[in-house]
Structures are given as C-alpha cells and as structure tokens.
Amino acid sequence: MRVLGLDLGTKTLGVAVSDELGWTAQGIETISIDEERGEYGLKRLREIIDEYEVDTIVVGFPKNMNGTVGPRAEASQRFAKLLESEFSLPVILWDERLSTMAAERMLITADVSRKKRKQVIDKMAAVVILQSYLDSKQ
C-alpha cells in the first residue's frame, strides 16, 4: 500500500511516494504541466501509480492563512476531482499551508544552490505534504 503525494503548481507538479509501510515520503520527480491548457501529466501519473502500486492520492490543498479557500485551493479541488475520475482512487485534499516555505528552508539549510532549489522545490513540497499526511496516520 503506497500513497502518492502531489504538489500542484501552474507549470509543474511535484510528485512524492510513500514507502510500502506508509511511514516515509520520498520525492520522485517534477512533471511539467500546463494548467491553462488542462495538461496535467496524467499519462506519466498513470505510469507512476502503476509502477508503485499506489492506492491513495494526497493533493496539497493551499488554503489561505485565515483558512479560507482561494484560487489556488480551488484549482487543487478541480485537480482532485479530475484524478478521482481518471484513476478511480481515493483522493485526499491535505492542508499544505507553508509546505513550499518548509521545503525551501530545508534546501537552504542543506546548502543547496538557488538554481538547484528551483529545480527540486516542487518535488520537495510534495514530500512535505505527503510526510505530513503520513505522520497524521501514525
């Protein structure tokens, strides 16, 4: 049983997957997408879901700091519905407030260059989101 964690942006989709026991999240990759065109990398997601035998998907849900739902959170809701329809798997929207900032902080602490951070930040945000979800289940 593995869980897939996703961090949706307008141009990229950060992807992480849990270990088989559901204890730890590992970053897999960042998929290039085009939200305006409705291109979400579903073919690649299908390959990842099949390869890792995923049974649940967790999508970052970026609420505003006051708990309200803004445009990015609405985009995540639409994306979650698309995933449920496409893959027939349970999709959980997970509060991801500050996940990108936490990922950025970890990369800075690890002395990762700005250029490299830009390349991996979405994947790391997906790891933060998924790990938060997994920790809540322990």
UniProtKB/Swiss-Prot annotation:
**Pfam families for the chain:** RuvX (PF03652)
- Keyword Hydrolase assigned to the entry: answer is yes
Q: What GO molecular functions are on record for this protein?
A: nuclease activity
Output the GO biological process annotations, alphabetical, semicolon-separated. Answer: rRNA 5'-end processing
> CDD domains from the xrefs?
YqgF
User: Localized where?
Assistant: Cytoplasm
Record's GO cellular component terms: cytosol
Origin: domain of life: Bacteria
Which InterPro entries does the record associate with it? RNaseH-like_sf, YqgF, YqgF/RNaseH-like_dom, YqgF/RNaseH-like_dom_sf
User: What are the protein's UniProt keywords?
Assistant: Cytoplasm, Hydrolase, Nuclease, Ribosome biogenesis
EC number of the protein: 3.1.-.-
Query: SUPFAM superfamilies in the record, alphabetically?
Result: Ribonuclease H-like (SSF53098)
Q: What does this protein do?
A: Could be a nuclease involved in processing of the 5'-end of pre-16S rRNA.
Family of this protein: Belongs to the YqgF nuclease family.
Give the protein name, as stated in the record.
Putative pre-16S rRNA nuclease
What lineage does UniProt assign to this protein's organism? Answer: Bacteria, Bacillati, Bacillota, Bacilli, Bacillales
